[in-house]
Regions:
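Periplasmic/extracellular loop-to-transmembrane helix junction in inner-membrane transport proteins
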Residues: 1-13
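Alpha-helical membrane-protein architecture signal
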Residues: 2, 32-36, 64, 68-71, ...
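Transmembrane-helix boundary motif in ABC transporter permease subunits
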Residues: 10-40
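C-terminal transmembrane helix and the adjacent membrane-cytosol boundary/short C-terminal tail
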Residues: 30, 87, 122, 164-198
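Generic hydrophobic transmembrane alpha-helix motif, especially the helices
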Residues: 41-77, 84-85
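Glycine-rich helix-loop "coupling/hinge" segments at transmembrane-helix boundaries
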Residues: 56-57, 133-170, 189-198
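Transmembrane alpha-helices
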Residues: 68-72, 104-138, 165, 169-170, ...
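Short cytoplasmic-facing helical segments at TM-TM junctions of multi-pass membrane proteins
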Residues: 81-123, 151
């Protein structure tokens, strides 16, 4: 289980940070968006698990390939939702801040990012679900360790009590991660409490 958590945590961390930066960049700059949009259209419809054989061939280790795919499955929804959040901000907010002498750095850090955070968390929830699926497939096919590998091993040896125990651990792990993300969201967005419907 610790191996699965480490693999998932590293991939989600990389995917979330890169997705947040990418979404913020294309939402703020039309020039950057011009070059990144084709990449989103190309990679968006492709399930990350479909790229597993290619990544296992390219990357020197199955661990690196799995981390990349987990990061990719998180990167796309976080990017799109962050971009949507930045683009959906009322332009009047920027105008008021500029009237008060706000710099571009202030507009990004104190206006754009806080206003886009609810969308960012929606992307995080979507990315976490997708990344968990990629984790299990990667452990079954490439990594050969962790919960996914144990589940496949138990099924192959007809050890059905072990298999159902692995499924229960998977369900509890996913539920715990989602609950933790809800707690983090409620803590960071306490100033919007009462205005969120999810």
């Amino acid at each position: 289980r610790s191996h699965s958590l480490g693999l998932l945590g590293l991939g989600v961390l990389l995917g979330t940070s890169s997705g947040f930066i990418t979404g913020l960049a294309i939402g703020w700059s039309q020039r950057i968006g011009y070059w990144v949009h084709p990449v989103l259209r190309l990679l968006g419809p492709v399930p990350s698990t479909a790229l597993l054989p290619l990544c296992l061939f390219i990357f020197p280790s199955s661990f690196g390939a799995s981390v990349f795919l987990i990061a990719l499955s998180t990167w796309f929804p976080v990017t799109v939702l962050t971009w949507s959040g930045v683009m959906g901000i009322d332009k009047a907010w920027y105008d008021v801040a500029r009237t008060l002498g706000a710099s571009q750095r202030f507009l990004i850090l104190r206006v754009a990012i806080p206003a886009a955070l609810p969308n960012v968390f929606v992307g995080l929830f979507m990315g976490l679900g997708a990344s968990f699926s990629v984790l299990i497939v990667a452990e079954m096919v490439g990594v050969k360790s962790g919960i996914g590998f144990y589940l496949q091993w138990a099924q192959g040896w007809a050890a059905y009590p072990n298999m159902y125990a692995a499924l229960l651990v998977m369900a509890l792990l996913c539920s715990g991660l989602i609950s933790g993300l809800f707690m983090l969201r409620d803590r960071l967005l306490s100033w919007q409490r009462g205005g969120m419907q999810w």
